Amino acid sequence: MNVFNQKMKLAAKCILLTLFLVCFTGIAQHKKAKFKVIAFYTGKNDQAHISFVHEANKWFPKIAEENHFEYDSTSNWDNLNAKFLANYQVVLFLDTRPETPAQREAFQKHMENGGGFIGFHFSAFALNDSSYPQNWDWYHNTFLGSGEYGSNTWRPTSAVLRVENQDPITKNIPKTFKSQPNEWYRWSNDLTKNPDIKILLAIDESSFPLGTGPKAHEIWHSGYYPVVWTNKKYKMMYVNMGHNDIDYEGKTNKTLSYTFENETQNKVILNALLLFGTKKGK
């Protein structure tokens, strides 16, 4: 009888230990998020930008789970207000920019109060006499520093990118690496002359000629083109990537390339997210 009781007690202890381990593992797996990210997008215009938005809204939740932060996204730009933004540490613009005065004021205050930001590709676009005129001087000239859109390459092609400055964002990034295909932008402002701008990645000369045309101005043969940079006065980064290659010629609108299928490129974005999400102050 004593032997039976001892076995029952041992079995009970094993069950309790198993339950404890299961509970502990569950708690560890669902530990509190380090920070929260909100992505704004429109997703209605260029199919290349729509494709990128869909891809981003699949990739970011995956890396959020792996790195213990939360990711939300919205196409309602009216959510760009102080009350809503108070729930998040980092804001992303996946394709366009805010257009109303209230939205713009809320975003500027978010940044001036130490919030984080990553903008992709078309989010910096501004061109007078277009649907996105340069009518927000703080954003395009002070914050991004780029000014107006100047020109772009065509069609989307890969480039060799070069690290221009050491930074926590470029930590463990090779000096040069090949990017995913992209439509590359040139800007009206010379970012090298802006003391607030820190250029992180630029197109390496080995990339030239860059683009395939058919128009001559869509092929770059020389020049200096920054593609990723920060503004030292804010927790921000602009990334020129964000235009997937699309089968326009075949009229299928099929996605031919994906921005987030590049580990090195992804590492730059993840480094920035983790830095902006956890760093206190500006």
Predicted feature locations:
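Extracellular ligand-binding/catalytic regions of CAZymes and related secreted enzymes
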Residues: H30-F35, W59-K62, E66, P209, ...
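A structural signal for well-ordered alpha-helical segments within the folded catalytic domains
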Residues: H54, K58, P101, E105, ...
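A glycine-rich, often tryptophan-bearing local segment used as a flexible ligand/cofactor-contacting loop or short
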Residues: R97-N172
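A short, polar/proline- and glycine-enriched secondary-structure boundary/capping micro-motif
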Residues: S130, P181, Y248-K251
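Catalytic beta-strand/loop cores that center a nucleophilic Ser/Cys/Thr
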Residues: N152-Y238
